[in-house]
């Protein structure tokens, strides 16, 4: 990498974009500093000196949010950054996906890309700056990389598309799209939307790509100026004689029949048996190099299985389980599966099954997001779990990984648009989707199961949502789009394009590919075919439950709202929280108070809510001049008696207003605890209440 500092500038969405090389992190294979507005990101790329065994490309992309970038000190006892937030993990995945397909085939060197956010401007996306930084760090390094790539955010406001919308613009945008690609094509899409049509989504993607092309050209100019020397990489060529021999043996032993097996587990058994039988032809225990040969044979076998699956789809239009290219697997759905859960839905599509379980909570149970931007409160959460048993395997039980976090977030994006507004449904909503069985498209099954759970729980959703995953097999100049891909088609195909939405439009999409990029024609066809599949799935789901239940579960908390004057909030809370804690202890409810005076009262017991509401009403009631009250004498002084009008509010009845006749001592007429009827005669500027019994005589 060049050791001389160089600075390159351009404009990006009406803000300055600067890329600096040659000054920082000079021991990395490649490093750049990206300045976008006031956002600053350091991106580095490092490759190992030796390749790794195996067939998987070991790429690791990291995205680190340093709290000092936003002028914050981390919370917690240690006061330092801990494990990456879910949002940082999702950004790392977002950067990984468009970069991964652009490394040479067969490249097995470890590559680690580190993106460190040093300064964060909320209106200048650190995520997109990091994507450009990652591309540039690879491009100016000696690591083989077929870039550059770039990514942009696209909003949709009042019928107009906007590149990299500001925070204020995002609030009114119907679309939150992230799209990436290179000069010739799009190769990554991620979006959440408010029922955007397929045509609107397609235009948004390629509106973004036009800006991507400009950014890629800018990066290419930098590369041409620096002229980095790339390390030579020559993939290991397989022995053609050996390939032909293995190919002949697989055909003789029924490769096509082994692939064309409806049941996933039986197909795996058949293929394993075939591979074992073919490999046995090459076993020679006396040959010291035999182990290396068997590894090569197994690698060839895997390639042949992949080629046969792709050939059958492309040429014969036959899928491994016998379906047509646009056919959905058999569907089953059920609601009310768990008696004590607030809502539950079981969705099965072929050999993929998801159980989604919903819990309702009070507003105090929302999630607090304290990242580089303003602190946010999230009242809808969707979590996704993928246990080993779902694919018939054993293994350690760990906390959620990148994949689980990503699939959970995709489901959350797909469903968040249909969650009712706070004013209509004052609850925190959490859904957990447990994948019980998986043969592809489990994230989309979790979306369908979650919709069923929402309706079962009685959540008044705006519309049901279903999700479907589309696949692609390219061959020479032709291509075949697949509806509802299974695991083998995902692993051996060219695309995993997830589309979720209502009958009216798209609420979320996610596209990953293994080829260089997709044309507008392919994306349009995939979106249109996905719509047909989505509508068919929605029809099936509505046969199970066609509308949200009219009542919440008996085990769910009931939440009611009431509004008080903001200046009365302190009366409800009391000194040091004394009064609000008394209400909670006495009634067992949960209380959440907003600054505008909105109070959320939550409890399973409706009577408890009524008691708490009554107490708060008494605390916040205001005396009215001319109103007659019957209250208890609380205190007696020489000059008069204090009578409780209602809890928290006393009135002074002067000694001259206690009786018609003149009295010398208040105690001659009243004692503490007496019930006394009085009429409010005055409320002074300080809120003190004066009353009279005499006025009623």
UniProtKB/Swiss-Prot annotation:
Domain KH as annotated: residue spans: 557-616
Positions with a binding annotation for Mg(2+): 490, 496
Keyword vocabulary terms for this entry: Cytoplasm, Magnesium, Metal-binding, Nucleotidyltransferase, RNA-binding, Transferase
Organism lineage: Bacteria, Bacillati, Bacillota, Bacilli, Bacillales
Xref: InterPro entries: ExoRNase_PH_dom1, ExoRNase_PH_dom2, ExoRNase_PH_dom2_sf, KH_dom, KH_dom_type_1, KH_dom_type_1_sf, NA-bd_OB-fold, PNPase
E.C. designation(s): 2.7.7.8
Known function: Involved in mRNA degradation. Catalyzes the phosphorolysis of single-stranded polyribonucleotides processively in the 3'- to 5'-direction.
First-level EC class: transferase
Protein name: Polyribonucleotide nucleotidyltransferase
Cofactor(s) the protein needs: Mg(2+)
A Gene Ontology molecular function term of the record: polyribonucleotide nucleotidyltransferase activity
Organism, scientific name: Staphylococcus saprophyticus subsp. saprophyticus (strain ATCC 15305 / DSM 20229 / NCIMB 8711 / NCTC 7292 / S-41)
Gene Ontology biological process terms from the UniProt entry: mRNA catabolic process; RNA processing
SUPFAM superfamilies hit by this protein: Eukaryotic type KH-domain (KH-domain type I), Nucleic acid-binding proteins, Ribonuclease PH domain 2-like, Ribosomal protein S5 domain 2-like
Domain S1 motif: 626-694
Chief location category: cytoplasm
Any one of the GO CC terms: cytosol
Cystine bridges: none
């Amino acid at each position: 990498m060049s050791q001389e500092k160089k600075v390159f500038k351009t404009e990006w969405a009406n803000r300055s974009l600067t890329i600096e090389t040659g000054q920082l992190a000079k021991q990395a294979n490649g490093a750049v500093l990206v300045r976008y507005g006031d956002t600053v990101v350091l991106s580095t790329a490092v490759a190992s000196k030796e390749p790794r065994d195996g067939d998987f490309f070991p790429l690791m992309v990291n995205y680190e949010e340093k709290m000092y970038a936003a002028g914050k000190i981390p919370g917690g006892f240690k006061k330092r950054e801990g494990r990456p937030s879910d949002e940082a993990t999702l950004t790392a995945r977002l950067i990984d996906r468009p970069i991964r397909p652009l490394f040479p085939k067969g490249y097995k060197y470890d590559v680690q890309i580190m993106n460190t956010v040093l300064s964060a401007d909320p209106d200048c996306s650190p995520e997109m700056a990091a994507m450009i930084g990652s591309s540039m760090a690879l491009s100016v390094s000696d690591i083989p990389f077929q870039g550059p790539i770039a990514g942009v955010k696209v909003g949709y406001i009042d019928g107009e598309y906007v590149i990299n919308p500001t925070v204020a613009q995002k609030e009114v945008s119907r679309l939150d799209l992230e799209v990436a690609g290179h000069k010739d094509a799009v190769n990554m899409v991620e979006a959440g939307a408010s029922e955007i049509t397929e045509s609107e989504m397609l235009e948004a993607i390629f509106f973004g790509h036009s800006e991507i092309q400009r950014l890629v050209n800018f990066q290419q100019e930098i590369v041409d100026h620096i002229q980095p020397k790339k390390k030579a990489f020559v993939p290991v060529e397989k022995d053609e004689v050996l390939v032909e021999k293995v190919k002949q043996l697989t055909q003789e032993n029924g490769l096509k029949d082994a692939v064309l097996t409806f049941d996933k587990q039986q197909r795996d058994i058949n293929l394993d048996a075939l591979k074992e039988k073919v490999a046995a032809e090459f076993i020679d225990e006396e040959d010291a190099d035999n182990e290396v040969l068997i590894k090569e044979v197994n690698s060839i076998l895997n390639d042949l299985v992949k080629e046969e699956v792709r050939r059958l789809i492309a040429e014969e239009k036959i899928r491994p389980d016998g379906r047509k290219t646009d056919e959905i697997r058999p569907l089953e759905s059920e609601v009310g599966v768990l008696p004590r859960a607030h809502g539950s839905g079981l969705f099965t599509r072929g050999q993929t099954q998801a159980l989604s379980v919903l819990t309702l909570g009070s507003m105090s149970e929302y999630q607090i997001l304290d990242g580089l931007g303003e602190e946010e409160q999230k009242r809808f959460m969707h979590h996704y779990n993928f246990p080993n048993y779902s694919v018939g395997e054993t293994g350690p039980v760990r906390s959620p990984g990148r994949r689980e976090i990503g699939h959970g977030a995709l489901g959350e994006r797909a469903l968040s648009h249909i969650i009712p507004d706070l004013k209509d449904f004052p609850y925190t909503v959490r859904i957990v989707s447990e994948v019980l069985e998986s043969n592809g498209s489990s994230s989309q099954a979790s979306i369908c199961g979650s919709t069923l759970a929402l309706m079962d729980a009685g959540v008044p959703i705006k519309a049901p949502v279903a999700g479907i995953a589309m696949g692609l097999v390219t061959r020479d100049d032709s291509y075949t789009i697949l509806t509802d891909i299974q695991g083998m088609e995902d692993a051996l195909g060219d695309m995993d394009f997830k589309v979720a939405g209502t009958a009216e439009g798209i609420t979320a999409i996610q596209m990953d590919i293994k080829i260089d990029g997709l044309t507008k024609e392919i994306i349009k066809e995939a979106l249109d075919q996905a719509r047909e599949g989505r509508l068919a799935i929605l029809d099936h789901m509505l046969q199970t439950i066609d509308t949200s239940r009219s009542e919440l579960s008996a085990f769910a908390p009931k939440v009611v709202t009431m509004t008080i004057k903001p200046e009365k909030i302190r009366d409800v809370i009391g000194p040091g929280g004394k009064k609000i804690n008394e209400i909670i202890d006495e009634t067992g409810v949960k209380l959440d108070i907003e600054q505008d005076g909105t109070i959320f009262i939550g409890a399973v017991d409706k009577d408890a809510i009524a008691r708490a509401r009554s107490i708060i009403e008494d605390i916040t009631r205001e005396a009215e001049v001319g109103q007659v009250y019957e209250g208890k004498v609380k205190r007696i002084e020489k000059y008069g008696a204090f009578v409780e009008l209602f809890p928290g509010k006393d009135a002074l009845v002067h000694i001259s207003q206690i009786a018609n006749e003149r009295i010398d001592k208040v105690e001659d007429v009243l004692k503490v605890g007496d019930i006394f009827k009085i009429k409010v005669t005055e409320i002074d500027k300080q809120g003190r209440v004066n009353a009279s019994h005499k006025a009623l005589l």
